[in-house]
Amino acid sequence: MKTKGLALNSILIVISTSIIGTILHESAHYLAGVLLNLNPELHHNYVIPLTKGTELQIVLMAGAGPLFSLVFGCLILYISIKFVKPSLTKLFMTWLGMGSVLGLLGYLLIAPFAKDGDTGRIFSYLGIPTFISIVIAIASFIFISYLFRKWSSQFIFYKTEYHFDKKETQKQLFIYPIFASMVIMTFLSFPITAWVSLLPTIFMPMTYFSTYAKYKRMDNINPDLTINKVSSVLVVLTILTIIIFRYLV
């Protein structure tokens, strides 16, 4: 009998790590705003400077979130890959790290279309032409695809039941959580102040399909960790993160 334990845990992980990554990203904006005396106000997926600042101050605040996300994501992935044994903790850290890395590289993808987003504001301040931002977006897409294919090796440790069913496992590891993230995070993001705030929640999860595609082509996968029960810790963590996220609205 097929179980959905891996799928449910993966969905809980993706939702909770998406929220944690978003709050940390926005908190970096907030802290930068405080240091720049902009009297910022923290919300679930945006920060408002209540004090009118200079263009440079606004750009510095805008850049703080993506920069923090990249550094944080790389650190989490390094720790997970080097020191954490296969477990739900490792799977959690893998999703958290990859999602955080998208906090910069993913924003480069949408910069040509989101002029009011973090990278869009920075590009505008630096006077970067639209065609250059498109070139940067394409380069970012290629780099993300390379990294995410490389990190597919971090998903080979898990299976849904004693007898490894790769087709079912890859659905539970990737397909269910990717689409769940797109739908649930979009729903949790309302109300929105600008349409641009929905772009990351709708389009960035699609980058994980490169990880899925690489995993799908892998041969000789022999996972030894069966995940067929839902973690109560993940349930509580996901509920708490959703409460905090909605409180910040």
Region roles according to the model:
Residues M1-I13, T169-Q172:
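N-terminal membrane topogenic signal
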Residues G5, I13-G63, L67:
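Small-residue-rich helix-interface/hinge motifs
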Residues I15-T17, G21, T226-V249:
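Final/C-terminal transmembrane alpha-helix of multipass membrane proteins
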Residues H43, G53-Q154, Q170-I184, P205-Y212:
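Metalloprotease/metallohydrolase-associated module, dominated by Zn2+-dependent proteases
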Residues I58-V59, F187-W195:
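Membrane-interface helix caps and helix-loop-helix hairpins in membrane proteins
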Residues I110-K115, Y215-T226:
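A cytosolic-side transmembrane-helix exit/cap motif
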Residues S153-L173, D219-I227:
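Membrane-interfacial, low-structure loops and terminal tails that flank and connect transmembrane helices
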